Amino acid sequence: MYNLNNEYKDFIKDNIVDSSKNYYSMIFPGIPDSGRKIHVSCTLKNYNNILDIVSRYCVKNRISFKVIKDINKYFANGHKNGDRSSYGKFITIYPKNEDDFIRHIENLYFNLYDYEGPFILSDLRYKDCKCLYYRYGSNIINRTYDSKGNICRLIEYNGISYIDKPRPYFYLPDFIKNPIEQNENISKSSNLLFKYKIDEVLKFSPIGGVYKAIQKYTNLKCVVKEFYPHTAIVNEKIDSLFLYTKEVSNLKKLKEFKFIPNIIEHFKDWQNYYIIEEYISGDSLDNYVSKNNSIILESDYKKSIKYIYDAVNILIKVTENIISLYEKGYIFTDLAPDNIIINKNNVYFVDLESVFMLNDNKDALNYTINFFNCTNSNEDNIKLVITNLLLYCFNKKSKVYDKFTPRQILSPIIRRCYQVDNILDLINEINDSETSIFRIKLLFEDYSKKIFSAVSSGEYNEPNLEPTKKEIFQVKSTMISSVGYEYDILENKNSLAYGTLGQFLALNYIFDYKHSKDTFLNYIKDYRSNSFFYGYSGLLYVLDLNEIGSNDIVEKILGNIDYTDKSLSTGISGIGISLLYNYLAKKNANTLKVLREISLTLKENEELDNSLETGRLGVSLFYIYYYYIFKDTEALSLAEKIINQVILDYKDNGYKKIISNQLKDNHYEYYLSNGICGLLSVLVEFTIKTKQTKYTDNIIEFTKLCFGIYSLSSSYFHGNAGFLYTFFRMQKNINISKKLEKNILNQINNFYLDITNTIINDEVYDISLQGNRKNFLGGKEGVYTILDMVNRNDDSKNIFPFII
């Protein structure tokens, strides 16, 4: 608790409420459902004084307020990975009405005028007080939920309703008037925009934006880097202004290096600080890898070898730059893949606030996890960053580099291209205690020459791959802990697809458990959404699977269907599939009537994308099951029509994915949720349910496109478990040649090993580093279900969402 020093401190201590994991609240009667709310920001120097002043005023005037519980979390939110829409909101005050708001904010203005805090992006500043802000918003939880079961903050204003969404900018609907005419939200100065035309936003963070711009009087392309005051706070001396000053100093000191952008100018404009520097065209290393890593995006072996050669040559230049800095007494502590620019034959370093002298005090240390270690020597950190940048060129799962060995990290790639095994030898040499950092560049150059020589002589030929041997990973009941229902009024934590309900589904599938109705009582009470993935339709399926009476659930669903949402995940395609499963057992006439209405409504689906989760493939899955149950030939025709259109769209455009906002090039998407594996699974389902083989050639064509794919995630709907599921069912149900089957079996084994390679102590670690993530489509429950299916060599169980 904070150190209050006003006459109400004992009253506050006795009456403050620990209202949530993030706030302490002082509640008085009269909080409106929605209205003006006042936000007060703070700095490390003044937060106790500000809280003392504001709490005294609020208690004296009986105004409800809340304060951030942990001041360290408040400041952490102001760093580069924080939430721009919420940073700065130290205290929130809830006036009872508009008149009270005007009176109280004016009084607080006089009390807080001399204090500063970060600018709150979602609010208007009150006059010229640098810590006092306000906005119109929702104040209560009114139990209005979206289709995913999460709270919508609904505002009713003079009979008009709208959703109050978090935004990193000020927003006020036209029908709500601002009672205060004067504010200081907009800059009094326009030095930046007078000189520069902003062309593109490169990135945003709570610290500020980075923009691509043009200098108006020269037409020179440049980068504008923005620093908001009172962000990136580390201690009373180190914050965003310190970072700004440090980067300006570094750019000037390092101008002798050709791989450092030139600084054009720097200045303060209004309250913000700006650095203008030379624009370096090209891709960040992060984007370069996404665009060019042909080992996992192509089946062309020669392209894969060329990529290895190119990656090694990039690392030669990176190493050369690092050693050049080191020889002059510098080290770059945040040399992450997004701070390296690949420009034709050159490699540049950017974002230089984290360049230090070797013996500097590094209190203001910025670094990216697993590319710097505060406890290492400078030389060991150079080896660490070079090693992990090299690993990143082949496997971008950098957040778990400290969890796995380089061999484990590279093994999925080595199975797809054996020559990557030599990268392991290179890494071992780099990290040998006898290897000097000055020798690393020579190691890369020698390896580059070997690759070039081998390619020229034809030594590297595409291998004749034999099925990879795998050890069976035995799934045990102790690996899935059904913690059950978790109450959270704001967020739906209990959905079938991405919540706690999926744990029971995994136990059903893997161990044939039958749960009692008592297990699901809290789920039944908590009605938020009708949807298949997130709401009652998913619960209905689980109840039916466990042979638990569900008539009340069915009636609730039938009475609350939104026919405008047609998707599998949240709309009538998924709801319809759950109702079809229920109808098979119950033969409810009302259910049949609604199913017919759903079938009619889904005929119009052109507005949807082509994905399984949110698009037309989900609609086609409903029609496949509708045909299977009712032998309705129109449903069969509709399923075929959708599938044919998706295939045609694919041939014209492909499943396209922008891997990064900065990328102009597209790549195929493969995932079950929204890619080729989703299409393949629907085609397999069509073949099984209709006993027709008309799509066999298409299945073979799309299967070949998936050879060599690999995901950074092990999950079922967005990763390797989905690939494994798709290929396993295809191998079991589609008539293919022996040669193709051999290749498919190799892919199955690869996917299996890709997954088991990420399991530590029964937890599945993916790129998110969430080893204890417990849900079906995105977590370990789905992963273990698919592994068990392959272990049994049996696809007779219908795995969600393919449930019929």
What are these regions (language model features)?
Residues 262-273:
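Short beta-strand micro-motifs within the conserved protein kinase catalytic domain, predominantly
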Residues 35-44, 199-201, 206-247:
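ATP-binding glycine-rich loop module of kinase domains
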Residues 354-422:
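C-lobe/activation-segment region of protein kinase-like
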Residues 148-200:
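Juxta-kinase regulatory segment immediately upstream of eukaryotic protein kinase catalytic domains
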Residues 249-259:
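Structural motif at the C-terminus of the N-lobe alphaC helix and the adjacent alphaC-beta4 loop
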Residues 115, 438, 442-485, 685, ...:
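Terminal, non-catalytic domain-edge segments
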Residues 8-22, 184-217:
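ATP-binding glycine-rich phosphate-binding loop
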Residues 322-342:
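Catalytic-loop of the protein kinase fold
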